[in-house]
Design a protein with these regions (language model features):
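Short, contiguous, well-ordered secondary-structure segments
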Residues: 81-83, 106-107, 114, 132, ...
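Conserved acetyl-CoA-binding loop-helix of GNAT-fold acetyltransferases
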Residues: 94-96, 102-119, 135-143
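Catalytic tyrosine of NAD(P)H-dependent dehydrogenase/reductases that use a Tyr as the general acid/base
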Residues: 103, 130, 168
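Hydrophobic alpha-helical segments typical of transmembrane helices
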Residues: 17-20, 109, 113, 151
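Conserved catalytic-core motifs of GNAT/GCN5-like acyltransferases
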Residues: 13, 127-129, 147-163
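GNAT-family acyltransferases
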Residues: 1-99, 116, 120, 159-180
Length: 180
């Protein structure tokens, strides 16, 4: 199972990905708005890779796409889709290594995943949320076509404090953005 873009390959995780996964998920800035607390150990990354190996992108539950930079053949991030039991709704999340941010890779990967979700899987609605302080993620979601639908005040207890969450939605009829 592969998705390809101009610069990326999105694929299943492999055992060899565990060290890179542990490294970028251990980064303090990467973990800042995420539910995990660094370090993201190698053992935890290995467990994650094993869990993902048993999942299918078209089945209910979370499936994480490993994002590989084609030119360097290195893991640079991941994009997750949580498909609801009804197979018509999904949630989206993404995490990228610090060295590969700000270069359009996350946007490219998220667009590829959304295209598959809407055109192959026939999902009607994709939802996403991010910490209100995570301006880069909010901008990315809006750039790929999501509509900011709201703000939940003090909705998540994260690392010792209450945080606000921004809520986003994207409907199949709005995909791809700018289509007639």
């Amino acid at each position: 199972m592969l998705l390809t873009t101009e610069r990326l390959v999105l694929r299943r995780f492999r055992a060899a990905d565990a060290p890179a996964l542990a490294a970028y998920r251990s980064d303090e800035e990467t973990a800042r708005y995420q539910s995990w607390v660094p370090p993201f150990t190698l053992a935890r990354a290995e467990d994650f890779v094993v869990q993902m190996a048993g999942r299918e992108p078209d089945a209910p539950g979370w499936f994480q796409w490993a994002v590989e930079l084609t030119s360097q053949r290195v893991l640079i991030g991941d994009v997750g889709v949580g498909l609801h039991d009804n197979l018509m709704q999904a949630d989206l999340g993404f995490t990228f290594a610090p060295a590969y941010r700000g270069q359009g890779y996350a946007t490219e990967a998220v667009r590829a995943v959304l295209d598959r979700v809407f055109t192959v899987q026939g999902v009607r609605r994709v939802s996403a949320e991010c910490d209100a302080r995570n301006e880069a993620s909010a901008r990315l979601l809006e750039r790929v076509g999501f509509t900011r639908e709201g703000r939940q005040r003090s909705s998540t207890w994260l690392k010792g404090e209450w945080t606000d969450d921004l809520l986003f939605g994207l409907l199949s009829e709005d995909w791809p953005p700018g289509a007639p």
